[in-house]
């Protein structure tokens, strides 16, 4: 009989399997692990609980979390509290989507492939690019993959990246670049934007591309037109990491001449979930189509002339070319991409613009309230839904006290950059009300 209720392998099964591979016991399988680091104590597990008792205990533990359904959140820095239409969970919970993996057999995967195709189409339209892929793991890895593409396309081994890009994305890029022997140089920011004078001096004939965030980590809108001219005059690629919601109002990077646009679609239909999983996107111009990482779904017709969808240009991919592939990403975030697609389709063009406008209006209202109450707000007013406020106490302490008032405070910028100690990055989305914004400003009155 089976040793464990939910593990169907019996003792006889175990014995036969060990005999086939030529070992006497399970312990023999771990002989490569040094004896001194093996765990040999009792697990000291508590007695089993009934399901109702277990649910009560887990609910008690979960209640310690500060969640955005009960707290007013002003935390952003790449992950945001946005409205998720109720239809999103209903659609993505359908079994034909929820269990689907990479649809290699198009004849039995038309629904999944069409959903991915629609995601690609919406991302391409938002970014102003020619095409987009089926998704990436997240915005950070999409950015790193874009840099790898730029290096491979230009045959150059150096990437410049703005210091106003999210610090975690910079770290992901550096990790990718190490294995590919690509040099990464960070161009410092000044007044919350890329230092263009430093960029001009850094551009040379060994630069594959320049990475900029739009809006950037500090919420500021970078001058893409000026950056595009500098980068392309150097025959390098312009790589833009963008918040797709902001593109409901801002001019799309593609219209400025960006070569690659990446980002994270978490803002559409995907909860914060402690930072992931989310959904990266990757959009390019036609000239880079055959070098795009990940899956591409294309529209075609079958032998009867009916419209159909297939995975296309697969010779780029690692399951075909192995070490010669354009990338070693071997999957996508199809379920989360579907969530974003449903959210965007539900909002529609008018709703998406309205959602973006509420982010802009409410964040600028909050900025004005801070200034009226004597707070120092840094940088220009050219921001989308995030801005920086200087306080007189460590942000960690401030945020702990805010929790007692039912508020999740902004991001502690000193975590990554000492010069921004006691500076809070405040995010204001469409979810925040005037009353919540006023209460937030009032709660910080003692630390301005």
UniProtKB/Swiss-Prot annotation:
Catalytic reaction list: N(6)-[(R)-lipoyl]-L-lysyl-[glycine-cleavage complex H protein] + glycine + H(+) = N(6)-[(R)-S(8)-aminomethyldihydrolipoyl]-L-lysyl-[glycine-cleavage complex H protein] + CO2
Gene Ontology biological process terms from the UniProt entry: glycine decarboxylation via glycine cleavage system; nucleoside metabolic process
Entries under SUPFAM superfamilies matching the protein: PLP-dependent transferases
Oxidoreductase as UniProt keyword: yes
Top EC group: oxidoreductase
One GO molecular-function entry: glycine dehydrogenase (decarboxylating) activity
Assembly description: The glycine cleavage system is composed of four proteins: P, T, L and H. In this organism, the P 'protein' is a heterodimer of two subunits.
Family: Belongs to the GcvP family. N-terminal subunit subfamily.
Name listed for the protein in its UniProt record: Probable glycine dehydrogenase (decarboxylating) subunit 1
Organism: Listeria innocua serovar 6a (strain ATCC BAA-680 / CLIP 11262)
């Amino acid at each position: 009989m089976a040793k464990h209720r939910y593990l169907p392998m019996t003792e006889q099964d175990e014995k036969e399997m060990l005999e086939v591979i030529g070992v006497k016991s399970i312990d023999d399988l771990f002989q490569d692990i040094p004896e001194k680091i093996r765990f040999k104590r009792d697990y000291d597990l508590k007695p089993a609980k009934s399901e109702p008792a277990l649910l009560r205990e887990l609910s008690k533990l979960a209640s310690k979390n500060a969640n955005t359904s009960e707290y007013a959140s002003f935390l952003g820095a790449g992950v945001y509290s946005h409205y998720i239409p109720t239809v999103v969970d209903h659609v993505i919970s359908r079994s034909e989507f929820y269990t689907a993996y990479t649809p290699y057999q198009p004849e039995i995967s038309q629904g999944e492939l069409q959903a991915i195709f629609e995601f690609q189409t919406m991302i391409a339209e938002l970014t102003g690019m020619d095409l987009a892929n089926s998704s990436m793991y997240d915005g950070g890895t999409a950015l790193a993959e874009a840099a790898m593409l730029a290096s491979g396309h230009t045959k150059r081994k150096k990437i410049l990246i703005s210091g106003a890009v999210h610090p975690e994305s910079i770290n992901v890029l550096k990790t990718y670049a190490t294995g590919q022997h690509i040099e990464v140089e960070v161009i410092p920011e000044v007044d919350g934007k890329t230092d263009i004078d430093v960029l001009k001096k850094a551009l040379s004939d060994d630069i594959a591309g320049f990475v900029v965030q739009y809006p950037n980590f500090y919420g500021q809108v970078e001058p893409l037109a000026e950056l595009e001219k500098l980068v392309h005059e150097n025959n390098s690629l312009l790589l833009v990491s963008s918040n797709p919601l902001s593109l409901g109002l801002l001019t799309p990077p593609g219209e400025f001449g960006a070569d690659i646009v990446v980002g994270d679609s978490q803002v559409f239909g995907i909860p914060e979930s402690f930072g992931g999983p989310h959904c990266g996107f990757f959009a390019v111009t036609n000239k880079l189509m055959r070098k795009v990482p990940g899956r591409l779904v294309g529209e075609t017709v079958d032998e009867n002339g009916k419209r159909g969808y297939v995975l296309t240009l697969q010779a780029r991919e690692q399951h075909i070319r192995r070490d010669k592939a354009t990338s070693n990403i071997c999957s996508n975030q199809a379920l989360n991409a579907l969530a974003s697609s449903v959210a965007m389709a539900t909002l529609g063009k008018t709703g998406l613009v309205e959602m973006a406008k509420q982010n802009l209006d409410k964040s600028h209202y909050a900025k004005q309230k801070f200034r009226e109450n004597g707070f120092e707000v840094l940088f220009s007013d050219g921001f989308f839904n995030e801005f920086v406020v200087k306080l007189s106490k460590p942000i960690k302490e401030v945020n702990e006290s805010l929790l007692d008032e039912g508020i999740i405070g902004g991001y502690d910028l000193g975590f990554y950059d000492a010069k921004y100690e006691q500076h809070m990055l405040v995010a204001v989305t469409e979810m925040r009300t005037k009353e919540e914004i006023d209460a937030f400003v009032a709660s910080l009155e003692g630390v301005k």
